[in-house]
Amino acid sequence: EARRQAGMIRRQGERLKSLVEDLNLTTKLEYALQPICRETVDLVEIGRQAVSEVLNSGLPEQYEIEFSEEHPGRAARTEGDAALLRRMLDNLIRNSIVHNPQGCHISVKVGAEDGRCACTVTDDGVGMDAARLEALNQEADVSSTQGGEHGLGLKLVWQIVKAHGGTVRFRQVGPHGLGICITFPAYNTR
């Protein structure tokens, strides 16, 4: 019993630490206080790292997560801050977990085509109603969110994407579930 309680306290402490870090980061991004360390980054590698980290952190058995490359062998590079881009993907994956306590299948797909890199995170969870999806697709709505059901994590995602010159689209997947597609300008390595 003591071990179970200690584990619960540890997990809650990690969650609180993560929330404080997200709050600090979103404030820094909002007021342009967060330096963006721009370098050529491989979004395929960042996607693999984000999925591996979630799997290695003890993903509960009611969740499945998979990673795939849209076009294997084709570079998916952009100019950006690797740590922030990884944080963005981590937030999207964890958003699927938090909002689907019954479990779900999560798919992370990365690729490049037509001068753009794309990161897509989908789940077959409970999804969202059409009005909320439409509101999330309005940057002002997400940027003005002050916490709430889909608040700080998605606000942080929007801010990271905006800082990298990207776009975000939220959509319904299948009969239920959520899909988020993020695109960035591709970095030409020629």
Indicate where each model-derived feature is located.
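A conserved beta-strand-to-alpha-helix junction within the catalytic ATP-binding
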Residues: 37-52
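Conserved micro-motifs of the catalytic ATP-binding
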Residues: 31-36, 75-80
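Short conserved segments within the C-terminal catalytic ATPase subdomain
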Residues: 57-68
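Short helix-loop "hinge" at the ATP-lid/N-box region of the Bergerat-fold HATPase_c
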Residues: 96-97
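Short alpha-helical segment of the dimerization/phosphotransfer core of two-component systems
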Residues: 11-16
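Short conserved segment of the HATPase_c
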Residues: 128-141
